[in-house]
From Swiss-Prot:
Example of a GO cellular component annotation carried by this entry: dendrite membrane
Keywords, comma-separated and alphabetical: Disulfide bond, Glycoprotein, Lectin, Pyrrolidone carboxylic acid, Secreted, Signal
Name of the protein in its database record: Lithostathine
The C-type lectin domain, residue ranges: 33-163
Keyword flag Secreted: yes
UniProt modified residues of type Pyrrolidone carboxylic acid: 22
Known function: Might act as an inhibitor of spontaneous calcium carbonate precipitation.
GO biological process, one term: negative regulation of cell population proliferation
Signal peptide: 1-21
Oxidoreductase recorded as keyword: no
Residues bearing carbohydrate: 129
InterPro entries found in the cross-reference section: C-type_lectin-like (IPR001304), C-type_lectin-like/link_sf (IPR016186), C-type_lectin/snaclec_domain (IPR050111), C-type_lectin_CS (IPR018378), CTDL_fold (IPR016187)
Amino acid sequence: MTRNKYFILLSCLMVLSPSQGQEAEEDLPSARITCPEGSNAYSSYCYYFMEDHLSWAEADLFCQNMNSGYLVSVLSQAEGNFLASLIKESGTTAANVWIGLHDPKNNRRWHWSSGSLFLYKSWDTGYPNNSNRGYCVSVTSNSGYKKWRDNSCDAQLSFVCKFKA
Protein backbone atom coordinates (compact mmCIF):
# COMPACT_ATOMS: atom_id res chain seq x y z
CA MET A 1 0.00 0.00 0.00
CA THR A 2 2.81 2.40 0.85
CA ARG A 3 4.33 1.77 -2.54
CA ASN A 4 1.10 2.91 -4.25
CA LYS A 5 1.05 6.15 -2.24
CA TYR A 6 4.55 7.03 -3.42
CA PHE A 7 3.64 6.23 -7.00
CA ILE A 8 0.53 8.45 -6.84
CA LEU A 9 2.48 11.27 -5.18
CA LEU A 10 5.26 11.03 -7.76
CA SER A 11 2.73 11.02 -10.61
CA CYS A 12 1.05 14.16 -9.25
CA LEU A 13 4.38 15.97 -8.95
CA MET A 14 5.34 15.08 -12.52
CA VAL A 15 2.03 16.41 -13.83
CA LEU A 16 2.20 19.65 -11.84
CA SER A 17 5.88 20.49 -12.38
CA PRO A 18 5.78 21.38 -16.09
CA SER A 19 2.74 23.61 -15.71
CA GLN A 20 4.27 25.37 -12.70
CA GLY A 21 7.36 26.32 -14.69
CA GLN A 22 5.26 27.35 -17.67
CA GLU A 23 3.14 29.75 -15.63
CA ALA A 24 6.23 31.36 -14.15
CA GLU A 25 7.75 31.74 -17.61
CA GLU A 26 4.62 33.45 -18.94
CA ASP A 27 4.70 35.95 -16.08
CA LEU A 28 8.16 37.19 -17.02
CA PRO A 29 8.28 40.42 -19.06
CA SER A 30 9.79 40.02 -22.51
CA ALA A 31 13.06 41.79 -23.24
CA ARG A 32 12.34 44.38 -25.91
CA ILE A 33 14.77 46.78 -27.47
CA THR A 34 13.66 50.37 -27.38
CA CYS A 35 15.18 52.81 -29.84
CA PRO A 36 14.63 56.56 -30.16
CA GLU A 37 11.86 57.70 -32.49
CA GLY A 38 12.88 57.50 -36.12
CA SER A 39 15.37 54.68 -35.60
CA ASN A 40 14.92 50.94 -36.06
CA ALA A 41 16.05 48.04 -33.87
CA TYR A 42 18.04 45.03 -35.06
CA SER A 43 19.81 42.62 -32.73
CA SER A 44 20.90 44.79 -29.78
CA TYR A 45 21.45 47.96 -31.82
CA CYS A 46 19.46 50.90 -33.14
CA TYR A 47 19.90 52.12 -36.72
CA TYR A 48 19.12 55.62 -37.97
CA PHE A 49 19.00 56.57 -41.66
CA MET A 50 19.90 60.20 -42.33
CA GLU A 51 18.87 61.66 -45.68
CA ASP A 52 21.14 64.73 -45.25
CA HIS A 53 24.34 64.68 -47.32
CA LEU A 54 27.65 64.91 -45.45
CA SER A 55 31.25 63.87 -46.06
CA TRP A 56 32.27 60.55 -44.51
CA ALA A 57 34.08 62.22 -41.56
CA GLU A 58 31.19 64.64 -40.92
CA ALA A 59 28.69 61.76 -41.03
CA ASP A 60 30.73 59.66 -38.58
CA LEU A 61 31.02 62.64 -36.22
CA PHE A 62 27.25 63.19 -36.47
CA CYS A 63 26.71 59.55 -35.46
CA GLN A 64 29.16 59.82 -32.54
CA ASN A 65 27.25 62.84 -31.26
CA MET A 66 23.97 60.95 -31.64
CA ASN A 67 23.73 58.43 -28.80
CA SER A 68 27.50 57.70 -28.91
CA GLY A 69 27.20 55.75 -32.15
CA TYR A 70 29.18 55.38 -35.36
CA LEU A 71 28.49 55.03 -39.03
CA VAL A 72 26.97 51.58 -39.44
CA SER A 73 29.27 48.56 -39.35
CA VAL A 74 27.94 45.62 -41.38
CA LEU A 75 29.20 42.48 -39.66
CA SER A 76 27.13 39.78 -41.39
CA GLN A 77 24.99 39.13 -44.44
CA ALA A 78 21.88 39.20 -42.23
CA GLU A 79 22.80 42.65 -40.94
CA GLY A 80 23.52 43.75 -44.52
CA ASN A 81 20.04 42.59 -45.56
CA PHE A 82 18.51 44.52 -42.66
CA LEU A 83 20.47 47.63 -43.65
CA ALA A 84 19.35 47.34 -47.29
CA SER A 85 15.71 47.05 -46.20
CA LEU A 86 16.05 50.03 -43.86
CA ILE A 87 17.43 52.24 -46.64
CA LYS A 88 14.89 51.08 -49.25
CA GLU A 89 11.96 51.56 -46.85
CA SER A 90 13.05 55.17 -46.27
CA GLY A 91 12.05 55.95 -49.86
CA THR A 92 15.39 57.57 -50.61
CA THR A 93 16.61 58.05 -54.17
CA ALA A 94 20.26 58.22 -53.05
CA ALA A 95 22.63 56.31 -55.34
CA ASN A 96 25.11 55.71 -52.49
CA VAL A 97 24.86 55.74 -48.69
CA TRP A 98 27.84 55.91 -46.32
CA ILE A 99 28.68 52.99 -44.03
CA GLY A 100 31.43 52.97 -41.38
CA LEU A 101 34.14 51.19 -43.36
CA HIS A 102 37.22 53.23 -44.27
CA ASP A 103 40.93 53.06 -44.96
CA PRO A 104 42.39 55.70 -42.61
CA LYS A 105 46.02 55.20 -43.73
CA ASN A 106 45.23 54.95 -47.45
CA ASN A 107 46.96 51.56 -47.65
CA ARG A 108 43.94 49.37 -48.53
CA ARG A 109 43.64 48.06 -44.97
CA TRP A 110 39.98 48.53 -44.16
CA HIS A 111 38.64 49.33 -40.67
CA TRP A 112 35.21 49.94 -39.16
CA SER A 113 34.99 53.34 -37.45
CA SER A 114 33.34 51.56 -34.49
CA GLY A 115 36.46 49.43 -33.97
CA SER A 116 34.61 46.20 -34.88
CA LEU A 117 36.69 43.53 -36.60
CA PHE A 118 36.59 43.57 -40.40
CA LEU A 119 35.70 39.95 -41.15
CA TYR A 120 32.58 40.09 -43.35
CA LYS A 121 32.95 41.60 -46.85
CA SER A 122 30.35 42.51 -49.47
CA TRP A 123 32.26 44.38 -52.19
CA ASP A 124 30.53 45.14 -55.48
CA THR A 125 32.17 43.58 -58.55
CA GLY A 126 35.39 45.43 -59.37
CA TYR A 127 35.64 47.12 -55.97
CA PRO A 128 37.54 48.32 -54.12
CA ASN A 129 39.46 49.90 -56.94
CA ASN A 130 42.30 52.37 -57.09
CA SER A 131 40.91 54.54 -59.88
CA ASN A 132 38.96 57.00 -57.72
CA ARG A 133 41.29 57.07 -54.69
CA GLY A 134 38.33 56.07 -52.56
CA TYR A 135 39.19 55.43 -48.95
CA CYS A 136 35.64 55.48 -47.55
CA VAL A 137 32.86 53.02 -48.31
CA SER A 138 29.20 53.27 -49.25
CA VAL A 139 26.43 50.84 -50.15
CA THR A 140 25.06 51.34 -53.65
CA SER A 141 21.50 51.45 -54.97
CA ASN A 142 22.61 49.43 -58.04
CA SER A 143 22.83 46.39 -55.73
CA GLY A 144 19.74 47.20 -53.67
CA TYR A 145 22.10 48.70 -51.06
CA LYS A 146 23.70 45.30 -50.38
CA LYS A 147 27.10 45.76 -52.07
CA TRP A 148 29.93 48.11 -51.16
CA ARG A 149 31.95 50.58 -53.22
CA ASP A 150 34.88 52.74 -52.23
CA ASN A 151 34.36 56.49 -52.70
CA SER A 152 36.19 59.72 -52.10
CA CYS A 153 35.74 60.53 -48.40
CA ASP A 154 34.81 64.10 -49.39
CA ALA A 155 31.72 62.98 -51.35
CA GLN A 156 28.49 64.26 -49.84
CA LEU A 157 26.21 61.27 -49.17
CA SER A 158 23.32 60.17 -46.98
CA PHE A 159 24.33 57.77 -44.19
CA VAL A 160 23.22 55.30 -41.52
CA CYS A 161 24.19 55.50 -37.84
CA LYS A 162 24.35 52.47 -35.53
CA PHE A 163 24.28 52.71 -31.74
CA LYS A 164 23.63 50.50 -28.71
CA ALA A 165 19.98 50.16 -27.76
